[in-house]
Amino acid sequence: MEALRQRIEAAFEARAEITPNSVEPSVRADVEKAISMLDKGEARVAEKIDGQWHVHQWLKKAVLLSFRIFDNGVIDGGETKYFDKVPMKFADYDEARFKEEAIRVVPPATVRKGSFIGKNTVLMPSYVNLGAYVDEGTMVDTWATVGSCAQIGKNVHLSGGVGIGGVLEPLQAGPTIIEDNCFIGARSEVVEGVIVEEGSVISMGVYLGQSTRIYDRETGEVHYGRVPAGSVVVSGTLPSKCGTYNLYAAIIVKKVDAKTRGKVGINELLRIVD
């Protein structure tokens, strides 16, 4: 894999000269290999190593190169047709393969090739972009969007209309990450590389970006870009420094461990007790 990484890095430096007609066959083959690895889950844009998330920038570069290398083509879509550079992940699947991978895909869910979908995953009418990683046992509910290179953990529930932001550029930006056993409430948005740590519950209509203040009401701490593990988060406001107005904030109203979360329903966790 190291040799492939080096070749992708070199091709990316020369990307300005690359077109679908001029690309070297070896470069095309390398990019296709990288996309295939992402598609199969053999590689991922980000992975947790020794408790820390590490981003493999060369895989993001491979995704960006694919847009320069591949030309638009007609894509069959049931009752209609599409015209794009990226084919659909399930275009060649048959009944046996869906059963083998234990994936449910409800029309008109759209999943682009180069994204990984784990076993026992349910995709309601939703969208998963290339480079994304959706782990086992996850539900992507109706009109939810998983952006490019986003990382979704095991047994996650992305409720209706949830937006998980994609990050391809700038290259130094990390992907948005939802760790294992999280619940993201309807119409919430998690973007700009925010990390929602394991076992957290995000209420309906919470918006999390790098500049969002995430206030822990029990400790008074303010977090940016990270929701600590086991947090229960709702929308709220915090006063301005001058005290004349309030600005949006996400409020951590309580912390729960896995044992408590397993015994108590999501709705019960979201009931705020003053």
From Swiss-Prot:
Pathway: Amino-acid biosynthesis; L-lysine biosynthesis via DAP pathway; LL-2,6-diaminopimelate from (S)-tetrahydrodipicolinate (succinylase route): step 1/3
UniProt catalytic activity: (S)-2,3,4,5-tetrahydrodipicolinate + succinyl-CoA + H2O = (S)-2-succinylamino-6-oxoheptanedioate + CoA
Entries under CDD domains matching the protein: LbH_THP_succinylT (cd03350)
Keywords of the record: Acyltransferase, Amino-acid biosynthesis, Cytoplasm, Diaminopimelate biosynthesis, Lysine biosynthesis, Repeat, Transferase
One Pfam family hit: THDPS_N_2
Amino-acid biosynthesis is among the record's keywords: yes
Calcium recorded as keyword: no
Subcellular location: Cytoplasm
InterPro entries in the cross-refs: DapD_Trfase_Hexpep_rpt_fam, Hexapep, Hexapep_transf_CS, THP_succinylTrfase_dom1, THP_succinylTrfase_N_sf, Trimer_LpxA-like_sf
Binding-site residues, substrate: 104, 141
Molecular function terms, GO-annotated: 2,3,4,5-tetrahydropyridine-2,6-dicarboxylate N-succinyltransferase activity; nucleotidyltransferase activity
UniProt GO BP: diaminopimelate biosynthetic process; lysine biosynthetic process via diaminopimelate
Record-listed E.C. numbers: 2.3.1.117
GO CC, alphabetical: cytoplasm
The family this protein is said to belong to: Belongs to the transferase hexapeptide repeat family.
Name recorded for this polypeptide: 2,3,4,5-tetrahydropyridine-2,6-dicarboxylate N-succinyltransferase
Organism: Shewanella sediminis (strain HAW-EB3)
